[in-house]
Regions:
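Domain-level detector for secreted/extracellular nuclease and nuclease-toxin modules, and
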Residues: 1-258
Length: 258
């Protein structure tokens, strides 16, 4: 069922698809799913959705005093799992599915702290730059600025580039985990039965300590088709072909809050 969801990209052979869930109002709700590369100890992408069940802000971020802060992912059953390296080679533990993306329940937020959801990110990139794009997506998908007015469902895929050597900056976690050279997002909006999409491609570097404006973030916009060309990942492939081909050509930042 996870592989047939709209947010789930096409997978690469040899990798492991993991999904985390919580019980919300008596129903099982997916926090996110991911494609984990067991050789590189890093996820190729994480995917999730904002909808009526998942857009609420009900709980705070997991308490940093709760140890381990970044536990091994129990869904890997210890196979090719990577334990946290506290030093992380000076990089931040960058959430792929952000903690602030999943605040609708305690379990859902805790699920975002597994090591499979972590990527080594430069501090200023994580805390000052990427976070602005994350905030925009949260505004579009959650119960805040736009509420449910922007999308009935907003599908999100995030990741860092780990497949090709020329898209890897280096290695962290005792040289076992690649540091992506680029990070990306692919978004699919469904509103009143109509589909639209946009994507973002961002070089992983230190952009300084001043948070960028949305006009600056807009410079990172690309179409989903362009992002597929950059990453080799087939996004939103579970859409009907005629819909997929149309929406994946789109890149209109003005209709996405920019």
């Amino acid at each position: 069922a996870v592989l047939s969801r709209l947010e789930t990209p096409a997978t690469k052979s040899g990798n492991v698809v993991v999904s985390h869930w919580s019980v919300e109002g008596g129903d099982s709700v997916m926090t996110y799913c991911l494609e984990y590369d067991p050789v590189k100890h890093h996820s190729r992408w994480v995917a999730f959705r904002f909808d009526g069940r998942t857009r609420a802000n009900n709980v705070p971020r997991k308490d940093g005093k709760i140890l381990p802060q970044y536990p091994e992912d129990p869904k890997l059953n210890g196979q090719n799992a990577i334990e946290d390296d506290a030093r992380f080679n000076g990089y931040d533990h960058g959430h792929l599915c952000a903690s602030a993306d999943r605040l609708y329940s305690r379990t859902a937020n805790d699920n975002t702290f597994y090591m499979t959801n972590m990527s080594p990110q430069i501090g200023n990139f994580n805390q000052k730059y990427w976070v602005v794009l994350e905030g925009l997506v949260q505004d579009l998908g959650k119960s805040g600025k736009y509420g449910a007015n922007f999308a009935d469902t907003l599908y999100v895929v995030k990741g860092g580039t780990i497949d090709n050597a020329d898209q890897i900056l280096g290695y962290a976690c005792s040289n076992r985990m690649p540091v992506p050279k680029y990070y990306y997002m692919a978004l699919l909006r469904v509103k009143n039965g109509a589909y639209s999409s946009i994507a973002f491609w961002m070089e992983h570097k230190d952009y300084g300590t001043v948070k960028p404006s949305l006009a600056t973030i807009k410079q990172h916009c690309v179409s989903v088709q362009t992002l597929q060309n950059y990453t080799g990942i087939d996004f939103f492939h579970n859409l009907p072909d005629v819909v997929e081909q149309k929406v994946e050509q789109q890149c209109d930042p003005s209709s996405w809050g920019m």
